[in-house]
UniProtKB/Swiss-Prot annotation:
Primary subcellular site in the record, as a coarse category: cytoplasm
Entry similarity comment: Belongs to the RecA family.
GO molecular function: ATP binding; ATP hydrolysis activity; ATP-dependent DNA damage sensor activity; damaged DNA binding; single-stranded DNA binding
Keyword DNA-binding set for record: yes
Gene Ontology CC terms, in alphabetical order: cytosol
Alphabetical list of InterPro entries matching this protein: AAA+_ATPase, DNA_recomb/repair_RecA, DNA_recomb/repair_RecA_CS, P-loop_NTPase, RecA-like_C, RecA-like_N, RecA_ATP-bd, RecA_C_sf
PANTHER family: MITOCHONDRIAL DNA REPAIR PROTEIN RECA HOMOLOG-RELATED, RECA
Protein name: Protein RecA
Keyword vocabulary terms for this entry: ATP-binding, Cytoplasm, DNA damage, DNA recombination, DNA repair, DNA-binding, Nucleotide-binding, SOS response
Keyword tRNA processing: no
Biological processes per GO annotation: DNA recombination; DNA repair; SOS response
Length: 356
């Protein structure tokens, strides 16, 4: 009996000490600096922005890329890294958000971005001279609290000032890795606070002397791997042909890391030259998988009505009838437990129809 009284006394003392500590922390660092997870506001719904690919939104588990987080997209050359990020920018702009593009590679094709649905006059662009300058610009934009999304293209092009000012053969090991590590330590908290999505595009390098395992690695050290909430590995796996002409690439994206949903899922979609991700093609493929769209031989039909013979014709039908495409997409999302597409994030064809 005495022991139980003693135990309850200690518990009461601990509770009082904890309450005093929490009050002191809140007084020193502000309200909300520490809280219990059950207090309501601690757990928030993750806000997302669509990737422009229905399959990838589903593979990410939350319906898109999470805001207030760092995302890394990496892959070989011409695999669709920049195309994917430009599609995300277009989706963010459709929701009324402001986006910035830090073009460290000095290679952004403005006409191509416009074709993908990016509102180019509203896009903020910077072409910095050094890695330090690029990351300082990112820091200033994030701290302003008025930017919804920033893309850095690419980590490999963030060249430290010392390297630019030095001689061609100078050995400066670990300089870029230290720069990235310092920048991410500084940025992460602000990114979360301002709910800004920051996407780093990265390139692949080969590790020398690797006999077993994967010899591929990404540039810029290990910091980005740790600080990223989502890491996407994008690869070109085939070509899309119309008669004998190659009109696009078949692309696979693997979710290598995901802190907001189970990882290791993947999505396969088409990237058409001059158009970007073929959302209509994905709706057809995923609709057939979910048994929402019927396929008999070469014919595709929806709700008993034929929508086209062959994938190209069915894709064209959905492009001309965006309301049917939206209906099928929302049914696919519903069947897979992913949030329905918001009204503002219409397809490109729908927006063009409205403008006309």
């Amino acid at each position: 009996m005495e022991e139980s009284k003693k135990g309850s006394g200690l518990t009461a003392e601990k509770s009082k000490a904890l309450a005093a500590a929490l009050a002191q922390i809140e007084k020193q660092f502000g309200k909300g600096s520490i809280m219990r997870l059950g207090d309501g506001e601690a757990v928030e719904d993750i806000q997302v922005v669509s990737t422009g690919s229905l399959g990838l939104d589903i593979a990410l588990g939350v319906g898109g890329l999470p805001r207030g987080r760092v995302v890394e997209i990496y892959g070989p050359e011409s695999s669709g890294k920049t195309t994917l990020t430009l599609q995300v920018i277009a989706e963010m702009q459709k929701l009324g958000g402001t986006a910035a593009f830090i073009d460290a590679e000095h290679a952004l094709d403005v006409q191509y971005a416009s074709k993908l649905g990016v509102n180019v006059p509203e896009l903020l662009i910077s072409q910095p001279d050094t890695g330090e300058q690029a990351l300082e610009i990112v820091d200033a934009l994030v701290r302003s609290g008025s930017i919804d999304m920033i893309v850095i293209d690419s980590v490999a092009a963030l060249v430290p000032k010392a390297e630019i000012e030095g001689e061609m053969g100078d050995a400066l090991p670990g300089l870029q890795a230290r720069l990235m590590s310092q920048a991410l330590r500084k940025l992460t908290g602000t990114i979360k606070r301002t709910n800004c999505l920051v996407i780093f595009i990265n390139q692949i390098r080969m590790k020398i002397g690797v006999m077993f395992g994967n010899p591929e690695t990404t540039t810029g050290g290990n910091a980005l791997k740790f600080y990223s909430s989502v890491r996407l590995d994008i690869r070109r796996i085939g070509s899309i042909k119309k008669n004998d002409e190659v009109i696009g690439n078949e692309t696979r994206v693997k979710v290598v890391k995901n802190k907001v949903s189970p990882p290791f899922r993947e999505a396969i979609f088409d990237i058409l030259y001059g158009e970007g991700i073929s959302r209509q093609g994905e709706i057809i493929d995923l609709g057939v998988q979910a048994k929402i769209v019927d396929k008999a031989g070469a014919w595709y039909s929806y709700s008993g009505e034929k929508i086209g013979q062959g994938k190209d014709n069915a894709r064209e039908f959905l492009r001309e009838n965006p309301e049917i495409a939206r209906e099928i997409e929302n049914r696919i999302r519903e069947s897979l437990g992913v949030a329905a597409m918001p009204q503002g994030a219409g397809s490109e064809a729908e927006i063009m129809d409205e403008e006309e």
